[in-house]
Amino acid sequence: MAITPLTHLPEQDVIVVGAGFGGCAALHHLRRAGYSAKILDACDDFGGVWNMNRYPGARVDSETPTYQFSDTQVRDGFNFSENYPSSGEMRRYFAHMSAELGLRRDALFGQKVVEARYDDESRRWVLSTEKGLVARSRFVVFAAGSSNKAYIPDFKNKSAFKGPIIHPKFWPENADMTGKRVGIIGQGSSGLQIVQELAKTDCELTSKNPSGRRAT
């Protein structure tokens, strides 16, 4: 028997957009306060930026004593292996945290919100997703963060480059740079983390900073 796609979510007190740290914390505390709430997230699981970013060397730049939930049941049940965990370990942490707090039952993944409007007549928010889901709520918490969109500069003559152009957000799984000439443009956190990892491989590596400022 065919499964009918969900097109209308039962009305909630609150819809939370985003399943990273902010969204997970919002859902947990809203439910604890007695509100009905659901998370909508464009990705396939919890984690936010740590679910999206899987490039070589991706890791936290804040130490774990401060970069985690303070809830005892979450904190005491997970031991980080490093002070600055990798993105892979952060995904394992989010799996642990979401299981401990029972968040998955109120989360809908693969639901990219494309419209949020307030209906004055019903005094409700109406959210629509790319897949056609419609959700209504009294309140909305926007917790999508600021790093969910890839910035790809329109460099002059970029189309003339015949090799692959890879943004860290879309790094291919198991990509092998051995024996290749690799140029890294940008020396922020992502750029430097990738450089540190690729420097361990047998490739010709060049790092450029278009801004001319020192690495950050």
What are these regions (language model features)?
Residues 3-11, 15, 19-39, 43-45, ...:
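Rossmann-like dinucleotide-binding core of oxidoreductases
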Residues 46, 55, 113, 171:
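Hydrophobic pocket-lining residues within nucleotide cofactor-binding pockets
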Residues 49-50, 117:
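Short Asp/Glu-rich motifs
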Residues 31, 51, 99:
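Short polybasic/polar patches that bind polyanions
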Residues 81-146:
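Feature captures the FAD/FMN-dependent oxidoreductase FAD-binding
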Residues 35, 51-93, 212-216:
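Glycine-rich active-site loop/strand segments that organize a redox cofactor
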Residues 66, 107-108, 163-166:
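Conserved beta-strand scaffold positions in the cores of enzyme catalytic domains, especially
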Residues 52, 76, 81, 102, ...:
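A short alpha-helix-loop-beta-strand transition element characteristic
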